[in-house]
Amino acid sequence: MVSLNPFLEQSIIMNRNNETTETFSKLWVTAMITLTMMLPVNVACSQTKQQVPQQSIKTIYPTKDWAISDFVVTAPEFGAKAEPGFDNRVAFQAAIDAAYQSGGGVVYIPAGNYEFRSTQVGTKNVRVRQGRSETKKDFHFEYVLRLHPGVQLRGDWADPASHNGKVLGTILEVRVGKDSPNYDGSVESWWNDGQADNALRTTYTSIADRFIEMNAGTGVTNLSIWYPEQDIHHVKPYPWTLFQTQGDCATIERVTLVNSYNGFNSAPSELHYVLNSYMTALNKGIEVHVCTDIGRIENVRISPEYWANSGLPGAPSLEDVTAYTRANGTGYQMHRSDWEYVSYLYISGYKTGVWIGREPGFADAPNAQLYEVHVGGCGNGLYVEDVNPYGILISNSSFGAGQDGNAVYFYKDFSTSVQFNGVDFKGSVVGDGDGGVVSFESCTFSEYNDYALRMNRGNVLLSQCEFKKNAGHVYLGANMHTLKSVNSGYKSKLKVDNHSTSAKVEVITGKKYFFEPIPKNVKTNIDVHPRPVSDRVLKADLARATGFNNDRPVKDVSADLQSALDAVKAAGGGTLYLPAGRYLVNNPIKVPSGVELRGSWDVQHHTQSGGTAIFTNYDGGNAGESGPSLIQLEAHAGIRGITLAQLNIASDGFSVENPRKTPFLIQGQGPKVYIINVTIAVGDKGIDLASYDTSGHYVDYLGGVPLRAGIWVGGGAEGGFIRNMQLNPHYGSRLPEGGQGYPEVFMMRFVQSNCSALKFADVKNQTIFNNFVYGSVYGIHFLKDAITGKYPGEMTVIGHGSDGCTYSLFVEDADKDTKIVAINSELVNTKIPNEPVRSYVLMGDKVNTDKVHPDAKLILYNSAFWGSPVIGAIINNGIVSFQQANFSRSGTQGVDVRGGKAHVYTSYFAQKIAETTVKDEGYARLGAQGKSIEFTNNYYISGFRFNKSGEGLIYGSDKK
């Protein structure tokens, strides 16, 4: 319970740089603040103890949030020392173990240099392949630190970009592992692919040594890692610095890897997230293997400069480091990853900047979307060994070669799809692939030697691309199949050196084919990360369930929690911190303005890793699903690092087929509310940002399985951000150790037929970035605002993924001013029972609907469509433009214009159509009331096949 006992206190508050900023009187309240190791019991009540509220941990360097931790490695019970010669392995592991036993939390490392001089031994049990049989065998590896689920390491980090490259603050010195024979070890093994009906695969399982082993639901943030004994003139291999083993969610944020040999390895697992980090890696920076749910790389810089400019003893010259990495290193290496999201990745000075290809041992390759990826000064800026049929989307990026290098190289195994939109190439693009389509839209080519494009095989599309030289544009090798170009070249004149034996070459120019190019410089993140103005923290000791058991909390703490929140508000704002455990909140609470409700998580997380959770049976009472939300955020209030679970969603007369209807779990009630690193283990509805004007709202990494509604936005909000939403039914069925009282529900079928994941109504200047939903009727949905009566305005959607949906993108309502621009969309349908019609895009709910204005616009730049559509895209009204798309599967009709208009440019229709087809089957259909379809500069694997039943017009460069 929270003890309300106000008193007057004179304080001198220090800012994060330890400068005195103000002296003031404050009215504060006291609360029980105790540190209790998590025991396998249900904490049914709490004692009352008056104690002075605390400030957050004082850091030397700026932080995006306030630093909060119950476990400080230098505390006497752990004994870490920032002293030369002291081995910190035991002390750090003790703090990590304590945090784990307490249910999870942050282990804090104050600024200083901490040495590590010894290892521990781990065991990996592997299904070893022996011919066509298998056996289970243990392999040993060495590691220094093991992060258990729910535990995060956090230090005090100085951004090198703000300190002339200097590495300052918390530095982990690795003085063990030099010249390890098992620095990157693996063993041939068997593996069942859960994404392919458990098909048996041959692969290689890593048994490599590692410095920090990251298990499910772990994080490494705000620190630097340095190898003092590495010598650029005598480079020795070291084990992986950071190694994600398996399971969901490993996060690396605000980390500098000064001179790793190998940086971060994501072994077969899911949901890695590397962001806002820097590294010099001498061999490999980031390597990804068999990631079967969205991995994210965001704002990461990989370059020789971070070691050279570190200011640390023995730092070599930039020239010496670059000479080594340019001869030996790979910045980012992606093997099979399903839907990897890569944005704002910067790589320079490597042999290979970005490598994309197969898993060792079998042919599975990735699909991915890359946005604002910039590679320069590399032997191969981008090396493409192979890609799965769904393709790679690359937008608003640049690839540059060093001397005698290639901006892009396609290896002989490539035979699918890579799409470049708004990409600048400095150096040659060379293609030795075996087929497929490489397409370029609104791209530039410069600084090449003989030819900008040297394509020896396959098919190439060029649309509105600029070549900076008046010669040497395209070389076609003997086995080239197709080159199609519209309005491309030097001043729109394309020069082709054709050495093919039978290539189809089509070069067209004309003003009638001009189109609006992909938008540039789109803002995707907020300028200042939200947090309370005050750094004061009240740690509430409320009744909760704890331990690795299946206990649920029994006491409703709603009133105590509200009292604590109000107390923080009364004292001028700050953070109410709930340590790890399961809390029962059966009545609505309101987070006051200027207050943050915070749990044990500094990073994104999955249900399976425990931590702080709010359990509830609240269902809206007499008002039902129209009742108040469980957690209500006033203006400038937030919630961070917590999991929510609706306990009674499928009980007491309800089931997974008919789950309980409840209000939204979270509702924003004013401007600048924020929801960060929140997970919904299961709930009926997620976040309501539509009932009030929540201008400036910020949602980053909502994960989970809401059943009927994910995030709904409207109410006239302006300047909001919805980022990194990750909705997948497995959040409801993958439980933490011991179950920990979470309901185990398998909701795939229900959400596919009932959920509307993302809704946008009356919003302006909305940022919608790198979101993903698996299973929904409508993956992303645009409609008229139920409160203001207004329509969606102009907005840009970047990196949206809808998988397993009935309609992956649905525009239900739009007026003449509606303009929705989508970049790097991946839209997928799957066969869903009782859903007879499925399509990637639905514009309007019926033919010539008056809910969609004829001038309303939907423009999709650089898209990938696959799965099991009945019809690829259904246009009932308005104008839909496909500016580069891979229709891996197009259904009966790829683009079905029943009303309104469509434009299709630079697209690949990869589904083969037999010479004798069913009625109406084709890549396009213009219905009796459809106005027009333009087809310009596309590739059709079975030739241009279309159907027309009215007076509308089919035109474009492909219509002969």
Model-derived segments and their meaning:
Residues S118-T119, H163-K166, V176, E229-K236, ...:
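Short glycine/acidic-rich loop motifs that flank beta-strands on beta-rich extracellular proteins
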Residues T218, G247, T292, D338, ...:
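Small-residue (G/S/T/A) turn/hinge positions that recur once per unit in extracellular repeat modules
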